[in-house]
């Protein structure tokens, strides 16, 4: 929402496939193997958590010529894999709405997430994304976005959990430095706890809502 409302000219993100882990490389290969073009941007805020913003464009899809997604992760490479999953699921959901009996009604409700997405998905609306798709801008390498130490296994090895600072502690410190508060609630069910799982819900009141 922050990027869209402020029309932020975000830096572009460059991906070097040779630096990607095996699993992430496969997501990137599949995600770039069609006529769809995914434009990646660095939307990281002062919280320091690597955040990707993507505009996926098509020249042959009249229903979904533009689709937008955003995601974040402590590890920029995991964020990249997530953005491709998010875009794929969004295309399925939006196409279902676009071909539904209430498509025109939903599209007219541009104050809703789905309505706005469908209205701006038509090729004739490509111009509303010019602040992202046009003009020169800085380019950041994927692994350089954010200010957190990415913890991922080295090629052929395993991650050393003791190496480097705890990224979660750094996130909390970044929030405090930005004057933000993290409210965390344990919502683990008895069934989840019995199998060793823990579930929390976190709210940061000072952060911009998703939509």
Language model feature labels by segment:
Residues 1-211:
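Helix-biased "structured C-terminal domain" signature
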